Amino acid sequence: MTTMPDMQKTSDTRKIPINKVGVKDISYPIVVMDKNKKFQQTVARINMYVDLPHHFKGTHMSRFVEILNAYREDIALDKMEPILQKMKEKLGASSAHLEIEFPYFIEKRAPVSGARSLMEYTCTFCGSLGEEFDFVLGVQIPVTSLCPCSKELSRYGAHNQRSHITVRLRYTDFIWIEDLVAMIEECGSSPVWSLLKRVDEQYVTERAYENPKFVEDIVREVTQKLLAHDAITWFSVEAENFESIHKHSAYAAIERDKKMT
């Protein structure tokens, strides 16, 4: 049998190492822990990268997918570190990175009618392994925000809009996505729901009006809650208000390493 040439293993004379190289945006089924139903199946977008020494021309792209296929029945949070270790071993790398983004669904009940519906939240698992394993959980929570300035100035109501609060965490003890969402969505003027009847719409509108928030208020309130959570060691929080009376958005961000304070 003729030996196939391995172009990736050939030498590169430019002497430039690459920090991250690999495959991006793979659509793949995964299983996520669900607080109420134990497990939830969803479909993720996955990125897999390793470093590449300066003397190699390229990495072996097919091996990333082979590793993913080897874990096809068991791609979950507790497999992040083993997958990263396998990436390092199979690709001869000193560092590996795995990014998993997926929709996660939580059943919510409307605030007055109690009507049930599913809300979608975009979540991320970001893991890396060099000498040590590092993991960051990310969740994006939609809320309603109502402008305090508009309320103060206007005789008839105030402008309001949907907002996104994005939190990323490092932690020492397991945190349920459901608990994180419930904690963070209280920092907006009002939570949002997929299904609202008329009595619910009245409640949400009036609640937001009585609870106006600037984007600055939102990130500060989230920060207070995350600082008070004993399991969280590092976090970043971003808030973006999709302004209903402007072409642009309003934005604020805070990052804290609790080990440094």
Swiss-Prot record:
- At the top level, the lineage of the source is Bacteria
Pathway entry: Cofactor biosynthesis; 7,8-dihydroneopterin triphosphate biosynthesis; 7,8-dihydroneopterin triphosphate from GTP: step 1/1
Which keywords belong to this entry?
Answer: Hydrolase
Q: List the disulfide bonds.
A: none
Which GO BP terms apply?
Answer: tetrahydrofolate biosynthetic process
Pfam families per the UniProt record, alphabetical: GCHY-1
Q: What is its EC number?
A: 3.5.4.16
Q: Which GO terms describe its molecular function?
A: GTP cyclohydrolase I activity
Per the UniProt record, the site (May be catalytically important) maps to 147
Its recorded reaction(s) are: GTP + H2O = 7,8-dihydroneopterin 3'-triphosphate + formate + H(+)
Can you tell me which family this protein belongs to? Belongs to the GTP cyclohydrolase IV family.
Q: What does this protein do?
A: Converts GTP to 7,8-dihydroneopterin triphosphate.
Tell me the protein's name. GTP cyclohydrolase FolE2
Q: Which organism is it from?
A: Geobacter metallireducens (strain ATCC 53774 / DSM 7210 / GS-15)
